[in-house]
Amino acid sequence: MKSRRVVITGLGMLCPVGNKVESAWEALKSGRSGIETLSAFDTSSFTTHFGGTIKNFDVSETMPLKDAKRMDIFMQYGIAAGAEAFADSGLDVDQLNPERAGVSVGTGIGGLRNIEETSLLIDRSGPRKISPFFVPGAICNMISGNLSIRYNLQGPNLSVTTACTTGTHNIGVAAGLIANGQADVMLAGGAEMATTPVGLGGFCAARALSTRNDDPSSASRPWDADRDGFVLSDGAGVLVLEEHDHAVARGAKIYAELVGFGMSGDAFHMTSPPEGGRGAALCMQNALQSAGLNPEDIAYVNAHGTSTLAGDIAETSAIKSVFGAHSTALAVSSTKSMIGHLLGASGAVEAIVTILSLRDQLLTPTINLDSSAEGCDLDYVPHTARDAKLSYALSNSFGFGGTNGSLIFARYS
C-alpha cells in the first residue's frame, strides 16, 4: 500500500441483526444477538438447531423478482449489499470511467441451496428439468459478474474464494489493484447463505458448531470457558474502495483509509490452526509491515473470534506474539459473538464494523463472555460497547485450509 492511497467511500451490509449498514450498526453497538432457532427446514435430526439468518429480506427492493428467481440467495444478498454500498458512495455511473472501475466480491461456498434443490429435482424429475440458469445462478463469481453488468464496471472483474477469509482477501486484493494503478474504484467484499440442510449438516458432521440448543442467543461466546463451537450464519458485506485523489476530486464522503493488508498460510491442517497461531501471527506482521506501522500504533483488533476451542486460544496467542507487551493495552472484540460466523461474508462485514468503530470512536462488545478461558486473558470488551480513542484498527480473518488475512484501517481526517 505504499504507492497510491486507498480509501473507503461506500458501505453495504446484510447480517442477522440488520439488513442495512446503519440498522445493523445500531444493533451491534447495543450488543444484540441475531442468533435464533432455524425455521426454514426441520432441524430436529441435526445436533445443532439454530443459526444466524437474514430476516425480512425483500429482494424486490434490489432487483426484479424474475431476475432473483434465476440466482441463489447468496447472490441476492451480495448484490443487495453492493447496491447499498454503491448508492452510499455517491458514485454516478454516467460520470465514472468504466474501464477504471471493477469488482471483487466472493463467497466461501457458493450456491449451496441452489445445488441442493437442483439435486433433489434431478432425483424427482430427471435432468431435463434443470433450469438453464442453474450454473450462472450458483457459481462463486457471479456476484461480481452481476454487479459489473449493473454498474457497467469494465475494469478488473474477479472473485477470490478462500473459505472464511474470502471477504478479507477480496478487499485486500481490490485495494492492491487500486494501489498499483490498475483501477480507481473497486467494489469488494463477500456473501454467504449456508444455513441449509447440507450446510448445517456438514458443519455438524465436522463437530464445528455449538450445540447450545436451549439458548441460541448465548451460543456464540468467543474466549469464554464454556464455548463449544461456532454459530453458522448468513449475510453479505460490500465496500467501495477508491483511489484517494479520485475520491477527493469528486467530493466523496470518506469513511477510512485502508493502509495495510497481510496474508499467510498455516501449512498445518485443513480445519485447525497450529498451536500458538503462528500463521495468524505472520499474517498480522505482514499487515503491519505493509502499513509501515509499529505494533504500538494499533489500538483495536476486530478478531476472527469464532468461539471454537482451538481457534480462540490460537488467535489470542498470535496477538500476544505480534504485539508483545502492547497486547495488554489492546482492545480485542468479536463481532461473531452477536451475529455468528458468516463464512465468506464475515471478513467484509467485520471490516465494515472496524471502519465504523474508527468513525464513531467506539468499540463493539464481545457478548456472552462470562468467564474467560484459561490462556484467554486480553481485553475482549465484554458485554457492553465503550468509547475509545482509535487511530488505527486491524481486522482478522482465518479460514479452513490455513488461509489467513488481516486488514489495517486508519481513521480519516
Locations of the language-model features?
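ACP-dependent fatty acid/polyketide chain-elongation machinery
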Residues: 1-67, 89, 245-257, 352-366, ...
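Flexible, low-complexity linker/loop segments at domain and module junctions
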Residues: 1-8, 93-98, 291-297, 328, ...
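Condensing-enzyme catalytic core mediating Claisen C-C bond formation in acyl metabolism
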Residues: 5-9, 36, 214-291, 300
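Conserved beta-ketoacyl condensing-enzyme motif
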Residues: 8, 29-162, 191-202, 295-311
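Active-site-adjacent elements of ketosynthase-type condensing enzymes
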Residues: 47-53, 110-114, 193-220, 262-282, ...
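Active-site-proximal alpha-helical scaffold in enzymes
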Residues: 78-91, 140-144, 148-192, 230-252, ...
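Phosphate/pyrophosphate-binding loops at sites that engage ATP/ADP/AMP, CoA/4′-phosphopantetheine
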Residues: 85-97, 247-254, 284-300, 322-326
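Glycine-/small-residue-rich "gating" segment that lines the acyl/pantetheine channel
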Residues: 124-131, 172, 176, 185, ...
